[in-house]
């Protein structure tokens, strides 16, 4: 019994020493830069509701543009190119389409973008009267149509 207690005590002491030694080593390492690019990682959502906080999210995608396009966005490369053209100003992607015929039904749809664009925090939303006005306002652009 005494031998067992001594063996368990010695094993616990050895484990503590190993953990202390590796923890000290991990803290001493300097963080390495992963990229020379400013981060451009976004979460884009479309939801039913008057504002982003209360909208029931129907679709959501991720979009990463630097160093190369990626994420779950179905057209990541085209979306990144479109955002680069407007310098990440999402409001410039929304316009009025004069040839669209939409009902006056009030069933609000909110599009939101949260994340970082070229290293700057982004928190943008736009609310449309219904799905038809959203599609008309977003047009054929790739960034906000997913």
Curated annotation (Swiss-Prot):
| Keyword Secreted assigned | yes
**PROSITE patterns from the xrefs?**
SSI
Q: Site feature Reactive bond: at which residues? A: 104-105
Q: Which Pfam families does this UniProt record tie to the protein?
A: SSI
Q: Coding gene?
A: vsi
Can you name a GO cellular component term? Answer: extracellular region
Q: How does it assemble?
A: Homodimer.
* Lineage, top ranks: Bacteria, Bacillati, Actinomycetota, Actinomycetes, Kitasatosporales
Signal sequence region = 1-28
Q: What is this protein called?
A: Subtilisin inhibitor
Keywords assigned by UniProt, alphabetized: Disulfide bond, Protease inhibitor, Secreted, Serine protease inhibitor, Signal
Say which family it is in: Belongs to the protease inhibitor I16 (SSI) family.
What is the native source organism of this protein?
Streptomyces violaceus
Q: Which cysteines are joined by disulfide bonds?
A: 65-80, 102-132
């Amino acid at each position: 019994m005494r031998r067992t207690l001594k063996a368990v005590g010695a094993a616990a002491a050895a484990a503590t020493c190993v953990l202390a030694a590796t923890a000290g080593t991990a803290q001493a390492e300097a963080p390495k830069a992963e990229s020379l690019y400013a981060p451009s990682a976004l979460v884009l959502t479309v939801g039913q509701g008057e504002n982003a906080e209360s909208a029931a999210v129907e679709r959501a995608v991720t979009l990463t543009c630097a160093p190369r396009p990626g994420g779950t966005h179905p057209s990541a490369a085209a979306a990144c190119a479109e955002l680069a053209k407007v310098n990440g100003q999402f409001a410039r992607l929304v316009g009025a389409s004069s040839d669209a015929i939409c009902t006056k039904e009030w069933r609000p749809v909110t599009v939101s973008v949260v994340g970082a664009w070229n290293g700057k925090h982004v928190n943008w939303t736009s609310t449309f009267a219904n799905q038809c006005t959203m599609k008309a306002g977003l047009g054929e652009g790739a960034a906000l149509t997913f």
